[in-house]
A protein has these predicted regions:
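Short linear loop/turn motifs
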Residues: 230-239, 345-349
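Short glycine-rich loop/turn motifs
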Residues: 31, 99, 230, 302, ...
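Carbohydrate-associated surface elements
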Residues: 121
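A structural motif corresponding to the C-terminal end of an alpha-helix
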Residues: 222-229
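Structured loop/turn residues at beta-strand edges in well-structured enzyme cores
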Residues: 85-88, 228, 416
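N-terminal glycine/serine-rich phosphate-binding loop of ATP-dependent small-molecule kinases
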Residues: 1-114, 142, 248-256, 441-445, ...
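Active-site core segments that coordinate phosphate-bearing ligands/cofactors
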Residues: 5-17, 23-25, 125, 131-195, ...
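Short beta-strand-loop/turn "lid" adjacent to the catalytic site in phosphate-handling enzymes
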Residues: 81-118, 147-153, 186-209, 234, ...
């Protein structure tokens, strides 16, 4: 098959897809990844580097945008070297990224004026509280589908403009640019030629109207962000320019962009309303495809754009859980309870039950469905017989309990029962957690062949745009489930466990402090 790239607004050329591949870039919270994917949706090669995160004050989370960019380019080079597949055999590039994380940079120099403020950062909680007290919550929710929370980008941009010397004046003069991580990467990978984001990332800023599909002037005014700072919004599967020749000699086109969780939804082939996936990464992120319907949640979830491709926008319900895999990192790095994350499954399974111990990992408050930025992490139910295994098991179980709360909220919002859950992310390889998840939900949990479904989704978006894959049906044929976890827990024990969890959450909420 060949494609005339001129039809995509690119230079006249034809591309023979024989022996070619798609490259996916996944710029996550803890690492950046470059993946080469073949026509069957299989991973041929990968390169990964960790991303350094700083915590300058309690509740503050930052990353160096230049270091993130350098690491992303480095893995692009490394995966070509490892695989022997170079830029002349890359048909297109897709990008997925940690969402909400905010970068502001100078339009002339291209240099960031401050570190990237990461999605987990809670520094803007006082400003958000003030907006809630002013009655702004309904405006934000009705326009964006989101709740007022420090999680989203709007208050982060506002903080940078208010706290960096000269930023307000530069913004007023049109000299500053704002972007989530995808925009920052696209701008730099194209040598400053393309300043754009996609609909999924835009929908996570709390500045984008998901009904009109445009930046919302009322919200820009509410957060005091000039419209001149905002990137162009494009389809998730479409043209984002070519990679600069000093980065990749043959300048492959960037043809797919999506926030990591939407890319994961696409990678799972959740193309139909009601299909649901959960990613167990730094946090847990559960998304349900709701088709062309924007479901207004009454149960603490957010409505967001699920994917925007082929001239059509599909929406999703989402529940964002702030602490999942990061809880395991906390046990290892902060408490030295485990020496490696892989040790957690064995320890958790070494005891027959949780011994009445519950762990609520509200290190950055609680996300869906509670949305309490002031909740505090707790471990409760300890006795003199409690051990290291007790705490590790409670931490593992916390991912499943939080996911249970989100899934039940989804079912209430849409008025139907979810029959199965597709899973990915690093913790989805923890057999203890996946079995406990199936037991709690009382439905099958489907484990994919690869944990890197986010990268697969980004590759699919790029490949569809250039005709590497024909249609969604071809992608569905690529989907491979390697294991299904079936529920075994009795209803009585399930309810006993959930009652203990609900009590633990109640104790962690700010209303109990």
């Amino acid at each position: 098959m060949s494609l005339n790239l001129g039809s995509l607004g690119m230079e006249d050329a034809s591309f023979d897809f024989g022996g070619s591949y798609i490259m996916a870039l996944d710029c996550g919270t803890t690492s950046v990844l470059a993946t080469i994917v073949d026509e069957y949706g299989c991973i041929v090669a990968q390169a990964r580097r960790s991303v350094k995160t700083s915590f300058p004050r309690p509740g503050w989370v930052e990353q160096d945008p230049m270091a993130v960019l350098a690491s992303q380019i480095a893995v692009m080079m490394e995966v070509q070297f490892k695989s022997g597949i170079h830029s002349d055999r890359i048909a297109a590039i897709g990008i997925s990224n940690q969402r909400e994380t905010t970068v502001v940079w100078d339009r002339v120099s291209g240099q960031p004026i401050y570190n990237a403020i990461v999605w987990q950062c809670r520094r803007t909680a006082p400003a958000i509280d003030a907006l809630v007290e002013q009655g702004c919550e309904e405006l934000v929710r009705s326009r964006t589908g989101l709740t007022l929370d420090p999680y989203f980008s709007a208050s982060k941009v506002q903080w940078i403009l208010d706290n960096v010397d000269g930023a307000r004046e530069s913004a007023a003069a049109g000299d500053l640019m704002f972007g989530t991580i995808d925009t920052w990467l696209i701008y730099n990978l194209t040598g400053g030629q393309v300043f754009a984001t996609d609909y999924t990332n835009a929908s996570r800023t709390a500045l984008f109207n998901i009904h009109t599909l445009d930046w919302d002037d009322d919200l820009l005014a509410l957060f005091d962000v000039p419209r001149s700072m905002m990137p162009e919004v494009r389809w998730s599967s479409g043209d984002y320019g070519r990679v600069a020749s000093d980065i990749m000699t043959n300048m492959p086109p960037i043809m797919g962009v999506a926030g990591d969780q939407q890319a994961s939804l696409f990678g799972h082939c959740c193309f139909r309303p009601g299909q649901t996936k959960n990613t167990y990464g730094t946090g847990c992120f559960m998304l349900m495809n709701t088709g062309d319907e924007i479901v207004e949640s009454k149960n603490g979830l957010v409505s967001t754009i699920g994917i925007a491709a082929d001239g059509k926008v599909s929406y999703a319900l989402e529940g964002s859980i702030f602490a999942a895999g990061s809880t395991m990192n906390w046990l290892r790095n902060n408490m030295s309870i485990i020496s490696s994350v892989s040790e957690s499954a064995q320890l958790a399974a070494s005891i027959s039950d949780n011994e009445g111990c519950y762990f609520v990992p509200a290190f950055a408050g609680l996300g869906a469905p509670w949305w309490d930025p002031h909740a505090r992490g707790i471990v409760c139910g300890l006795t003199g017989a409690s051990s290291r295994a007790t705490i590790v098991r409670a931490a593992c179980e916390s991912m499943a309990y939080q996911s249970y709360d989100v899934l039940r909220a989804m079912e209430q919002d849409v008025g139907l029962s979810i029959e199965r859950l597709s899973v990915d992310g690093g913790a989805s390889r923890n057999e203890f957690i996946m079995q406990f998840q199936a037991d709690l939900l009382d439905i099958p949990v489907l484990q994919c062949e690869t944990v890197e479904t986010t990268a697969i989704g980004a590759a699919y978006l790029a490949g569809l745009a250039v005709g590497y894959w024909e249609d969604l049906e071809e992608l569905e044929q690529n989907a491979q489930i390697v294991r299904t976890f079936l529920p075994h827990m009795s209803a009585e024990r399930r309810e006993q466990n959930l009652a203990g969890w609900r009590d633990a959450v109640r104790r962690s909420l700010s209303t109990a402090q």
